[in-house]
């Protein structure tokens, strides 16, 4: 039985991925708090705060064959209402943590053996995201990091790549204050695992249905699309 490591797997899409993988892999979830549900036999949990200065915990998991990083958070708000501590914590958890974890597993990525690695980014990293400016900035940095590292991996002759998973809003998670609903996240989890296993480097859920047009509008006139995004968020009812 192969081993998989899910960072941020206690809820949302991370939990759904962990549960799907547990059907045929031994899975370890690393997160700040444990899942609120009882876990199958093949899933273990280790507590870790991604704001910790010591990431040595990941050196004890070098035997995994799959790494999926899903940890992250955001706050929908005007920038004037965002605290400086929120800015620091956002980059630490959303960006720096993922980069540090990849560094701990980089020898595995460079090696000749299959190592499946993916990171939850966001469509917000592909365009301006007013009222979500800090979150979008953390994800934009992560997007460029992944693209850059994938070029380095290719040029080194490695068969491995990092999968950038960049969805819009995902139903069935507690990201926007809702609750976990596996009925709404399981299908997406299966799709992500499929892209991981085929070593794709980018997966944008609902690309053809929604985001191809959105990205094209942004490319054509990023100012107008930014205003549209601002108005859409205000009308969404998610502003606190």
Predicted regions and their residues:
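N-terminal Rossmann NAD(P)H-binding glycine-rich loop of SDR-like oxidoreductase domains
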Residues: 10, 15-18
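Conserved NAD(P)H cofactor-binding loop of Rossmann-fold oxidoreductase domains
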Residues: 70-75
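Substrate-binding pocket helix/loop in short-chain dehydrogenase/reductase
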Residues: 78-79, 86-88
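Active-site helix of classical SDR
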Residues: 102, 138
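Residue(s) in the substrate-gating loop at a strand-loop-helix junction
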Residues: 122
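Active-site loop immediately N-terminal to the catalytic Tyr-X3-Lys motif
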Residues: 127-134
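C-terminal helical subdomain
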Residues: 160, 164, 177-217
């Amino acid at each position: 039985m192969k081993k998989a490591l899910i960072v941020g797997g206690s809820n949302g899409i991370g939990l759904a991925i962990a549960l799907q993988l547990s059907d045929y892999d031994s899975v370890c979830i690393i997160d700040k708090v444990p899942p609120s549900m009882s876990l199958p036999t093949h899933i273990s949990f280790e507590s870790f705060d991604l704001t910790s200065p010591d990431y040595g915990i990941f050196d004890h998991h070098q035997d995994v064959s799959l790494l999926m990083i899903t940890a992250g958070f955001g706050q929908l708000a005007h920038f004037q209402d965002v605290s400086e501590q929120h800015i620091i914590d956002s980059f630490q958890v959303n960006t720096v943590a993922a980069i540090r974890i990849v560094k701990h597993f980089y020898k595995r990525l460079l090696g000749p053996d299959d190592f499946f690695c993916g990171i939850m980014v966001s469509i917000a990293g592909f365009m301006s995201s007013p009222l979500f400016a800090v979150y979008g900035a953390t994800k934009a940095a992560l997007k460029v990091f992944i693209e850059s590292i994938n070029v380095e991996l290719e040029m080194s002759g490695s068969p491995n790549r990092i999968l950038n998973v960049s969805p819009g809003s995902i139903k069935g998670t507690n990201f926007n204050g809702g609750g976990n609903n596996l009925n709404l996240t399981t299908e997406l989890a299966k799709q992500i695992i499929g892209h991981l296993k085929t070593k794709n480097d980018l997966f944008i859920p609902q690309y053809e249905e929604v985001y191809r047009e959105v990205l094209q509008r942004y490319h054509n006139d990023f100012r107008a699309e930014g205003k549209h995004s601002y108005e859409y968020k205000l009308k969404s009812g998610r502003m606190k």
